[in-house]
């Protein structure tokens, strides 16, 4: 029975490794702050973004991720600030944290080059008791790991009116140590993540715009992964799109610009190699520019 318990716990820990890595959102291209801190202030007006994602519905302990963020450009200055609260839970692991963002933008001819950094703190909690093992009295399965850990990231974003190119590493720290019962143990840390992003906007006519985008992701010890996306906007109000993530998933996206200030989006994701592993994602954004007398680009495609 003990071997069965250990097998179950080991399997769940292996699955929970997904939470140790940077969360991947299907709608990342509409708020790249999670991927690139240089994106702070890119929209020129103050804006708040809310995002929640649920995976593998119906499975106890399935991944759940969410965040709320705010960023804005400082008036008459070339720098921007922002902040974010987030959580990322899966099986026995719980992560939550706070982040601050700072970016500096250098105007160029017909484009802008922005450099940004993020900094914050993350609470990591792994409760092995959540596994509900058959042999509940096993001390090895009653351990709780809890620690507060520093986070930092860096990014660059070069953008024009209809295009952007970005390079970033939202997590510069790789692994951590923690004290449990007076003993130093290795905690499951986050491997270094490196992103290259890019996109372009094609105006088909006055009512239709196409926006292809690409994201390359490199993680230490894992194959290079790319995310290819195509979105179409109709009348600056309705956006429909689809994404393909190599060897991982396909994503369908629907966006609605209710007015110049408020946008809502939904993404449905289906894993390619695993059945019954769908994910649902909801995004909402509100921009304060209209209230402050500033012009809002409706819609802003990135």
Task: Please identify what each model-predicted range represents.
Residues 1-2, 19:
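Initiator methionine at the very start of the polypeptide chain
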Residues 14-16:
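N-terminal signal peptide c-region/cleavage motif recognized by signal peptidases
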Residues 20-302:
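Subset of outer-membrane beta-barrel
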């Amino acid at each position: 029975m003990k071997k069965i318990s250990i097998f179950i716990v080991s399997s769940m820990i292996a699955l929970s490794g997904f939470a140790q890595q940077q969360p991947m959102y299907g709608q990342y291209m509409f708020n790249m702050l999670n991927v690139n801190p240089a994106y702070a202030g890119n929209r020129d007006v103050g804006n708040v973004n809310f995002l929640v994602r649920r995976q593998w519905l119906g499975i106890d302990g399935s991944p759940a991720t969410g965040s709320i963020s705010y960023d804005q450009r400082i008036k008459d200055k070339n720098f921007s600030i922002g902040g974010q609260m987030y959580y990322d839970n899966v099986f026995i692991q719980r992560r939550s944290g706070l982040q601050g963002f700072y970016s500096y933008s250098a105007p160029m001819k017909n484009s802008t080059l922005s450099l940004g950094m993020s900094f914050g703190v993350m609470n990591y909690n792994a409760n092995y008791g959540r596994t509900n093992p058959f042999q509940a009295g096993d001390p090895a399965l009653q351990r709780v790991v809890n620690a507060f850990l520093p986070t930092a990231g860096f990014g660059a974003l070069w953008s024009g009116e209809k295009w952007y190119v970005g390079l970033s590493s939202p997590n510069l720290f790789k692994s951590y140590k923690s004290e449990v019962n007076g003993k130093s143990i290795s905690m499951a840390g986050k491997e270094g993540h490196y992103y290259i992003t890019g996109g372009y906007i094609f105006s088909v006519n006055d009512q239709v715009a196409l926006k292809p985008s690409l994201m390359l992701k490199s993680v230490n010890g894992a194959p290079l992964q790319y995310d290819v996306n195509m979105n179409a906007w109709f009348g600056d109000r309705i956006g429909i799109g689809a994404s393909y993530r190599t060897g991982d998933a396909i994503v369908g996206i629907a966006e609605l610009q209710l007015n110049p200030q408020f946008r809502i989006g939904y993404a449905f994701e289906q894993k390619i190699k695993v059945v019954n592993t769908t994910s649902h994602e909801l995004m909402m954004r509100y921009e304060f520019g209209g209230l402050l007398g500033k012009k809002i680009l409706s819609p802003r495609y990135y």
